[in-house]
Amino acid sequence: MSDFLNVPVTLIGASRGLGRVLAETFHAKGAQVFVVARGRESLDALARDLPGVRTLACDATRDDAAARVLAVQEPRVLVLCGGAMTVNIAFPDLDWDRFNVSWETDTRISFNFLKAVLDKPLKPGAVVVTMSSGAAINGSPISGSYAGAKRMQMFLNGYAQKASDRKGLDMKFVSLAPARIMAETELGAAGIRDYAVYNGVTEAAFLNAMGPAQTPKDVADAVLTLIGDGKPGGNFLVSAEGVSALS
């Protein structure tokens, strides 16, 4: 799949940040873009900026969210990029409820939507993309359960692919982890600020030590490539050097 003209694309959590860049990318390709997010205000702004994009204000962590979303549009491409802002506090200073936020948002969204498309399969050839994080590989000591939650998304992606293959559903499941924090997103800017404080350095020094980072556009381009390359699903990492498969 390389031509996205009139292809139904549903994005979960795409009213801002990386998700918005993905929405802009698919819109520019002529796709039938449907964006789901919690915030009505940010959705209205996106709809004004991207004429023709449909939106739905919905808490994607709710048990009925997947059924509501899939009833509006059956996607040929489903992208799960929703999640919570990280707490950015070292874990000894967190209680369990604050520590656990990413499990109850990012992972729960993946759990619910992956189950839904396996219970009521999308049409053959459909692709489901889960946005994970490089934190799933390297950890993130001031982000609560974020690293573990993003790692679990990778596992769920693999489980979903195996379940699809066993049922002969001809669906492709892909997870993509941006390797570095991206200053261009709200999540990334907050992480850079708080990690600089945590390490006792300036933001510039933290970024310099981190090395070159991929941009949101790099990530969007990687998503398009993984959807259209005709290869099996799997877990992938995107960095400033390009896309690589994760074992």
Residue ranges and their predicted role:
Residues 12, 75-83, 106, 130, ...:
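Rossmann-fold scaffold of SDR-type NAD(P)-dependent oxidoreductases
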